[in-house]
Amino acid sequence: ESFCKTTGGKGLHVVAPLKRDVDWSELKAFTKKIAANFATAAPDRFTINPLKRERHDRIFLDYLRNDRGSTAVAPYVVRARPGATISLPIEWNEVNARLDPSRYTLASVPKLLASRKNDPWAGMTKHRQTIAAAQRALGLAA
């Protein structure tokens, strides 16, 4: 089970609630393998290279957020950017070619939240998964 949110910038964060049964280095290695598989399968679309000058028009898969001490913007945070964009939890069906994270702003989000029938992250705290099953399913077992 995973959940998605905008970053308040151009990106998205995928959040997967996990049991504390692996250490940070194991988790980072796992997420790096997933990201590298995407980058290898579609090198014209994805990259794991953090250097902006090397990305061109590719999507940067930032597995580096999965390390002890790394930070990621919290949900519902207003970013210090033009338009006062917000890091907003969204439903997976909202992740499509029409998604425009810049429309989630301090001005627009209160109305959006009032109109939502469900919290996209409802039940998140009930999920605690291991990465072992995902590793096996993806052929990434250590």
Task: Show which residues each predicted segment covers.
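Short beta-strand
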Residues: 2-8, 49-53
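C-terminal accessory nucleic-acid interaction domains of nucleic acid-metabolism proteins
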Residues: 25-142
